[in-house]
Amino acid sequence: MKNALKKIVTPILAALLLSGCASEETPPKKSDASASASAAQSSGSEDNPPIQKDSFYPTFDDNEDYASMKDKLAKQIDCILNSDTPPFSMYLNNKAEDISKWKKTVTKTEKDGNIYISAIYTDPSDSLLATLSATLFQDSPTVDFTVHLKNTSDKNSPIISKLYGMDILVSLPKQGNHFTLNTTQGCGVQGSEDYDDFGLETYKLLPSTWRTFEPKQGRSSDEAWPFFDILGDHCGLLVAVGWSGQWKARFSEKNESVAIQSGMANLNTYLEPGEEIRTPSYSITYFEGDAEYGHNIFRRLILKHYTPNTETKYVCKLPLSMSALADRTETVFKSNIAAAAKYGVPVDNLVIDAGWYTDVKPEANGIVSGSIPWEKWYYQAGNWSFNTSLFPNGNLKSLSLMAQKNGIGVALWLEPERAHSGTHMIDNHSELYFSEEAGGVHLLNLGKEEAREWLIDYISNLIEENNLSIYRQDFNMTPEWFWDNEYPFDRLGIAEIRYIEGLYYVFDTIREKYPAVLIDSCASGGRRMDIEILKRTVILWRTDYCCNTYGKNFFDEGTQFQMQSLSYWLPLHATGVGTDKFESYNFRSALAAGINFNSYISEENAEDAKFLVSQASKMRPYYYGDYYQILEPVYDFKSWQAYEVWRNDLGKGALVVYIRENAKETV
């Protein structure tokens, strides 16, 4: 990192301190804000032109660097598989099952450099069959695995509980006299929309003491984070849980090693004859070096194996999006597109967010007075047809074609998993939902084939009829109660498993049918992020923090904190600017691999809009590279903040520095 940083930091800081802006272009007009921001690039001269579009697809020449780490990880895996203690565990009829007595068969195959492992365990009575399927990646010191459990008998199985798909001891040298575990708070810990989403949490692992984590009420990153690092002496692990529901993970020190257990939080069920269930998936990355190095290996892993490919077979490109609630008519949206094209603002995408299905009426100017009220867009979920007062044709086809001619895609918001009593879906298709409701809220039962097929057909029609480039699926409810109350206690967990499997099936089917269409996963912001979701979707709205009132309970410094904290783990995510202005400090606070901003571009703000969006476009590819926290993320109004994004394959990067309102002149 230091070698890379030396290439750009000295000239950039010199320019920053002299001019307040290190870009080669003319900066936008000065704002009244006393705070300033700088974003600088190490490219753009005549001899060194700006990076081109294909630079969104990084090439990683890192296999040699990983050889020793991959070898050590493979030996750990062999040690675990060859031991009497299996790498998973369960209780049967409330007693710990001794799986070491089960018959075990392990096979390995190699394809494209990856090593595929199948470990099959059969209980002595030949009634339960457990299959551990693992992949040891050729291009990363990482193993990915899942356990499936099947009842192969002709009668119900014993009650299965405490099924940990990962129950392992990993040998690491200690960091001093202990291991250190890091994770984050997840999304929404302090409230529905809070500045410290994804703030780092650090713990010591102690013998005989379990440190336990699980999310809130069924969304995988709601007040918890299914990603962890465990640090030893100049080495460590990155552990990820792949379950978009109610997972559980716990960590401890045991016999000078790290003990890890993880599975579903709520499981107490028998299996019917022939019935099969699965555990969460898991990813373990081993690294040698400091935590920053390990996290950059993990970011590269996410790009290589846990990011959806577009039809070009490359890692996806997050858009620069004009974004708005559906609080205006199609004519006004068309004028927004026309203005962006007229003034040369390099917009990729127009996001039409919630409200297009409500019964609101626009004023004579085509705008809904006061925008879409919360009680409209929220409680009318389930009326999934276009408001013809806003969209006279009952679709977006004309709007999408006009946008496409100007090189702009269209994204549309939908929240199909939730519906309210009194809406079309509940009045006409209540059989597709869970049998219980909560305060008029209903949850689509994706464990039912007919519900899955309805949703696939509806999304498919939405994409085709409206020529969508991005489909945004939101999820503004907590599903755990619905899952846990669908069946008797001796079938606890089955509804959740079938629901999560159904969710993945829907996303996989849509991805297969429309490989050029991105699925944007939103869940009250970023409350459903895990490796299974990341494999299938992108995160274009990482938090609802910027839905708050600017200057009251939303500040640019919070956006900066979230960007720096989340980027330590994941490379691809985006957020909203949060205001209707194009002001440099505010806009640059939201810089990331993608960005959402005001759709009202006019002669008055066109110069600033073009400058800032163009700068975001030029910087965007660097976020696909390695990430370095130059200064530790802090939420305040007096510090400097700085981070670097660096593309080793290009030998180029960017340094972003924020000088906050009450900051001292030097740092």
Briefly describe each language-model feature range:
Residues 65-67, 80, 84, 92, ...:
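Active-site-proximal substrate-binding groove within the catalytic cores of carbohydrate-active enzymes
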Residues 26-48:
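N-terminal, intrinsically disordered, polar/charged segments of Gram-positive cell-envelope systems
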Residues 18-20:
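C-terminal motif of bacterial Sec signal peptides marking the signal peptidase cleavage site
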Residues 269-288, 655:
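Short Pro-Gly-centered flexible turn/kink motifs
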Residues 315-460, 470, 480-482:
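Aromatic-lined carbohydrate-binding/catalytic grooves of carbohydrate-active enzymes
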Residues 44-251, 265, 667:
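Polysaccharide-binding surfaces and accessory modules of carbohydrate-active proteins
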Residues 1-9:
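Bacterial N-terminal signal peptides that target proteins for export
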Residues 147, 274, 350, 403, ...:
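Conserved, mostly hydrophobic/aromatic
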